[in-house]
C-alpha cells in the first residue's frame, strides 16, 4: 500500500509525467530487446499504440483508385504520404469499414468449401446439447487425442503432395499421388475449388486441416473422440464438468471406432483357425471399412488398441513399444530385469511354469477406467498407487498389478485348478491363467495379501481388502490417489515380430501383445464393415453362413462344376466350406459327408443323373471328413434359427428352395441369386463341364485311335482331334479348340451336340 501511495504522489507531479512521456529510451540493452528479430515482443501494447495512430494500416497503391479519399461522414480514409521503406500507402481503419460496406462483392460459393471444417464445427455445436454442470474432483489424465474433427488420415507427406497439386498445380516439383485416398481427394478438391478467389495460402492451410490428423497430449477426464476434444474447454475444468452430447459425428472418429471393432472380430476369428497368422492377413486384406480397404486404413491410422496393433504387426508395420497385460497398457519408466523360467506351486498344489522378471522396475499402467504407478522387485510388489473412476475399476487395476508382481502370496491364493482355455480350446499361458482366475473372484487374493497402517499423505488414502477406502489401514503397498497417471506420451514406434499364433514381440523377445489381450467387448460399428473372407461369414450368425456358402457356390459355379467332376477332393477341402460345418450337428457330419460323396460318385458314373441344383444343395455337406457307412438320408439337418431345420435331398424346403420358372434360389426365404445353367439341360452337365474347350464334331471316327477317357483329354494339343468315351459307353469325336474365347458356349452346345452325335 505504501508503494502505491508513493507512486500516486509521484504521478500527480507534472514533472514526473513529462519525464516518463518525453524522455528518449537510450539504454542499449532495452533498445536491443525491443528491436532485435522480427518477433513482436509486446503484441498487445504494439496493437494499442498502432491503433491510436491515424493511419495504422498499409495497403497496395492500387487502393487509391478503388476507395474515395473521404467517406460519407467526411472522414479521411487514406493519407497521401507513402509508408516509409515501401511503396505502399497509409490507410485508416475506416477504409476497411468502407471496403466491407461498399467494396466489390465476390462469390461466396467457395467459402463453405474451403472453410469446411469450421462450418461443420458450427453445425455440430448448434445441434449439440449441453447438460448440467456438476462440481466434483476431476481425475484427468493426459492422453494423446485427436484435436481436429473431420479429417482424412493422410500422412504429412501425402497431404503436402495433394495440397501442392490442388492449390499450386503449375508449381515445379515432383509429386507422386499413389494411394487411392490421395487420388480421390485431389480429384474432388480440384472440382470444388475451380475459379476459387480465396488466397491460395489460406486454401492450403484449410486443406491441411482436412487431410491430416493432428494430435495433442492433453489432460482428459471423459470422451476422447475428436468431437469431444473440440469442446474440451467447455466440458471439463479443474473441479467441474459439463455434460455434452455432440451434434454430429465425424468420419475420422467413426473410422477409429469401426477399425477397432473390425480388428477385434478378425483377431478373435483368426485365433480359432488352423493357421492364425495367415488367416488374419487374408481377412485384413479382404475387408473394407466404410468402402476403404482395411490395410490402407491400418497403414495410416495411429489408433493404438490391442487388436489393431496385432493386425499392424502382422502387416509388418511398427507399433508402440509399450506392452499389454490384463487390458492395461504397461510402460516401463525405469529399472530393468532379466527373465528366468521358474516352477511355482499354487494353493491347490498345481505346478505352474512362469517367466519371472528378476530385478527392480517401475511401470505406468493405463487402462480405460483406471491408471496406476507400479514399483516392483523380483516377485514382490513394492508400491502401487492407483486412481480410477470407481471402486470396480480400481479393483481391476489392483488385481492386474498383483498378478503381474508374481508374488508368492498371490500364487498361493489360487483355489481349485487352473484350466482356462482360449477360443481355440488351447490352454492359456500361466500368467493369463492366474489373471482369469482372480478376475473371476479376488476375495482370497485380497484377504491373503496383508494390510499395513498408513501415514497421512496429501491426496492419498488406503484401500481395504473389501475395496472400501480407509485413512488408517491399507492393502500392503497399495494406495489410492486422487490424481490420475498420464498415458505414455511418446509417439515412437518400434519394429516388432509376430509368430503364427499372433504373439507380438519386440526385438529383445519380450511379448508385447497376444490374442488373450484382445477385449471381448462387443460394439456396433459406425461405418459398414464388409468382410469378404469366408472366415467372417459366421460373424452375423448361422443364417449368414448358410446364405454366404450357397452364394459362393453359385458365384463360382463354372469352376466348381469342373472341380466337382475332375478333382472333387480339392473342392471338398476348400476353406469356404469350413464355416458351414458348424451348422451341421456334430454326430451327423461324417455320415452326411459319406452319404453325399457316394451320391456324387454315382452321378459321375451314370450319365443323365447330373443335377445342378442338387449338387449345389448338397456340396457343403461333403466337406466334412466322411464316414464309410451304408446310411441313406432323405433329408439333412442344419442348425439355424435356434433349432434344426431340414434340407430335403430331393425337392425344395424352406431352407433351400429353387424356383424352376425364375431360376432363382431362395435360402431361408431370402433371395440368394440366379443359376445361369438350366438344371434340365444339365443332365449331361458333367460332359459339358469337362468338354469346355472342345468342339464336338460328331460320331466316333476310328482314324483317331481308341477312345480316351474324359481325364485323358487334357493332354491334347490345340486343334488336335480324338475320340472320347462319355457317360454310358458312348463315344464321340472331339477337337481341342484353337481359341479360348469360345469356351463359354461349349457347355451349352456340348449337351445338344452329344445327343445329336449319339443319336
UniProtKB/Swiss-Prot annotation:
UniProt site (Avian adaptation): 627
GO biological process: 7-methylguanosine mRNA capping; cap snatching; DNA-templated transcription; symbiont-mediated suppression of host gene expression; symbiont-mediated suppression of host mRNA transcription via inhibition of RNA polymerase II activity; viral RNA genome replication
Alphabetically ordered keywords of this record: Cap snatching, Eukaryotic host gene expression shutoff by virus, Eukaryotic host transcription shutoff by virus, Host gene expression shutoff by virus, Host nucleus, Host-virus interaction, Inhibition of host RNA polymerase II by virus, mRNA capping, mRNA processing, Viral transcription, Virion
GO MF term list: RNA binding; RNA-directed RNA polymerase activity
Family matches, as SUPFAM superfamilies: PB2 C-terminal domain-like (SSF160453)
Transmembrane regions: none
Gene3D superfamilies: Polymerase Basic Protein 2, C-terminal domain (3.30.30.90)
One cellular-component annotation, GO: virion component
Motif (Nuclear localization signal): 736-739
Compartments (UniProt record): Virion; Host nucleus
Keyword Transcription in record: no
Family annotation (Pfam families): Flu_PB2_1st (PF20947), Flu_PB2_2nd (PF20948), Flu_PB2_3rd (PF20949), Flu_PB2_4th (PF20950), Flu_PB2_5th (PF00604), Flu_PB2_6th (PF20951), Flu_PB2_7th (PF20952)
UniProt keyword Secreted, yes or no: no
Function statement: Plays an essential role in transcription initiation and cap-stealing mechanism, in which cellular capped pre-mRNAs are used to generate primers for viral transcription. Recognizes and binds the 7-methylguanosine-containing cap of the target pre-RNA which is subsequently cleaved after 10-13 nucleotides by the viral protein PA. Plays a role in the initiation of the viral genome replication and modulates the activity of the ribonucleoprotein (RNP) complex.
Family: Belongs to the influenza viruses PB2 family.
Subunit-level organization: Influenza RNA polymerase is composed of three subunits: PB1, PB2 and PA. Interacts (via N-terminus) with PB1 (via C-terminus). Interacts with nucleoprotein NP (via N-terminus).
Name of the protein this chain belongs to: Polymerase basic protein 2
Amino acid at each position: 500500500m505504501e508503494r502505491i501511495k508513493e507512486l500516486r504522489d509521484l504521478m500527480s507531479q507534472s514533472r514526473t509525467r513529462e519525464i516518463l512521456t518525453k524522455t528518449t529510451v537510450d539504454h542499449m540493452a532495452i533498445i536491443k530487446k525491443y528491436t532485435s528479430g522480427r518477433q513482436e515482443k509486446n503484441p498487445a501494447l504494439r496493437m494499442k499504440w498502432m491503433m491510436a495512430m491515424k493511419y495504422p494500416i498499409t495497403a497496395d497503391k492500387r487502393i487509391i483508385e478503388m476507395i474515395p479519399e473521404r467517406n460519407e461522414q467526411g472522414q479521411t480514409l487514406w493519407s497521401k504520404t507513402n509508408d516509409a521503406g515501401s511503396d505502399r500507402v497509409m490507410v485508416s481503419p475506416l477504409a476497411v469499414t468502407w471496403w466491407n460496406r461498399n467494396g466489390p462483392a465476390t462469390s461466396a460459393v467457395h467459402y463453405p468449401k474451403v472453410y469446411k471444417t469450421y462450418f461443420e464445427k458450427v453445425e455440430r455445436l448448434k445441434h449439440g446439447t449441453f447438460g448440467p454442470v456438476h462440481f466434483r474432483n476431476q481425475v484427468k489424465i493426459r492422453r494423446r487425442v485427436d484435436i481436429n474433427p473431420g479429417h482424412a488420415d493422410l500422412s504429412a507427406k501425402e497431404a503436402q503432395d495433394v495440397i501442392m497439386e490442388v492449390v499450386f498445380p503449375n508449381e515445379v516439383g515432383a509429386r507422386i499421388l499413389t494411394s487411392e485416398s490421395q487420388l480421390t481427394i485431389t480429384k474432388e478438391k480440384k472440382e470444388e475449388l475451380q475459379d476459387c478467389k480465396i488466397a491460395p495460402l489460406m486454401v492450403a492451410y484449410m486443406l491441411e486441416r482436412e487431410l491430416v490428423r493432428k494430435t495433442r497430449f492433453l489432460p482428459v477426464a471423459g470422451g476422447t473422440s475428436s468431437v469431444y476434444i473440440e469442446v474440451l474447454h467447455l466440458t471439463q475444468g479443474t473441479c467441474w464438468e459439463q455434460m455434452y452430447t455432440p451434434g454430429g459425428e465425424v468420419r475420422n472418429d467413426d473410422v477409429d471406432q469401426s477399425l477397432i471393432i473390425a480388428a477385434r472380430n478378425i483377431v478373435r476369428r483368426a485365433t480359432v483357425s488352423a493357421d492364425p497368422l495367415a488367416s488374419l492377413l487374408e481377412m485384413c486384406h479382404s475387408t473394407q471399412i466404410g468402402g476403404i480397404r482395411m490395410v490402407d486404413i491400418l497403414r495410416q491410422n495411429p489408433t493404438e488398441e490391442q487388436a489393431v496393433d496385432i493386425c499392424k504387426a502382422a502387416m509388418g508395420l511398427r507399433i508402440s513399444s509399450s506392452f499389454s497385460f490384463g487390458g492395461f497398457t504397461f510402460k516401463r519408466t525405469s529399472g530393468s530385469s532379466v527373465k528366468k523360467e521358474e516352477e511355482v506351486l499354487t494353493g491347490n498344489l498345481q505346478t505352474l511354469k512362469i517367466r519371472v522378471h528378476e530385478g527392480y522396475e517401475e511401470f505406468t499402467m493405463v487402462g480405460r477406467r483406471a491408471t496406476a504407478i507400479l514399483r516392483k522387485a523380483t516377485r514382490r510388489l513394492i508400491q502401487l498407487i492407483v486412481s480410477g473412476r470407481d471402486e470396480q475399476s480400481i479393483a481391476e487395476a489392483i488385481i492386474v498389478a498383483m498378478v503381474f508382481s508374481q508374488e508368492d502370496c498371490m500364487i498361493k491364493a489360487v483355489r481349485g485348478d487352473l484350466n482356462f482355455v482360449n477360443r481355440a480350446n488351447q490352454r492359456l499361458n500361466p500368467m493369463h491363467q492366474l489373471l482369469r482366475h482372480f478376475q473371476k473372484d479376488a476375495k482370497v487374493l485380497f484377504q491373503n495379501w496383508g494390510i499395513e497402517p498408513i501415514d497421512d499423505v496429501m491426496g492419498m488414502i488406503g484401500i481395504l481388502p473389501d475395496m472400501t477406502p480407509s485413512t488408517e489401514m491399507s492393502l500392503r503397498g497399495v494406495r489410492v490417489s486422487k490424481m490420475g497417471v498420464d498415458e505414455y506420451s511418446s509417439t515412437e514406434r518400434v519394429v516388432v515380430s509376430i509368430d503364427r499364433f499372433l504373439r507380438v514381440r519386440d526385438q529383445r523377445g519380450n511379448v508385447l501383445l497376444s490374442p488373450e489381450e484382445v477385449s471381448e467387448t462387443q460394439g456396433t460399428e459406425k461405418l459398414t464393415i464388409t468382410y469378404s473372407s469366408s472366415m467372417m461369414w459366421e460373424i452375423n450368425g448361422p443364417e449368414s453362413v448358410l446364405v454366404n456358402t450357397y452364394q459362393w457356390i453359385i458365384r463360382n459355379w463354372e469352376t466348381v462344376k469342373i472341380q466337382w467332376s475332375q478333382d472333387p477332393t480339392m473342392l471338398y477341402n476348400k476353406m469356404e466350406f469350413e464355416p458351414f460345418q458348424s451348422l451341421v450337428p456334430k454326430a451327423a457330419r461324417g455320415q452326411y459327408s459319406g452319404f453325399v460323396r457316394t451320391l456324387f460318385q454315382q452321378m459321375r458314373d451314370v450319365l443323365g443323373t447330373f443335377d445342378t441344383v442338387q449338387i449345389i444343395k448338397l456340396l457343403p455337406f461333403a466337406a466334412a471328413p466322411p464316414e464309410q457307412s451304408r446310411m441313406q438320408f432323405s433329408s439333412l439337418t442344419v442348425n439355424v434359427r435356434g433349432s434344426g431345420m431340414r434340407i430335403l435331398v430331393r425337392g425344395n424346403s424352406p431352407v433351400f428352395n429353387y424356383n424352376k420358372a425364375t431360376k432363382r434360389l431362395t435360402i431361408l426365404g431370402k433371395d440368394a441369386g440366379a443359376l445361369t445353367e438350366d438344371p434340365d439341360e444339365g443332365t449331361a452337365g458333367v460332359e459339358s463341364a469337362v468338354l469346355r474347350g472342345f468342339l464336338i464334331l460328331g460320331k466316333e471316327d476310328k482314324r483317331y485311335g481308341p477312345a480316351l477317357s474324359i481325364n485323358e483329354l487334357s493332354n491334347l494339343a490345340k486343334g488336335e482331334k480324338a475320340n472320347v468315351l462319355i457317360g454310358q459307353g458312348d463315344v464321340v469325336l472331339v477337337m481341342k479348340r484353337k481359341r479360348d474365347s469360345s469356351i463359354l458356349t461349349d457347355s451349352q452346345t456340348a449337351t445338344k451336340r452329344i445327343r445329336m452325335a449319339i443319336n
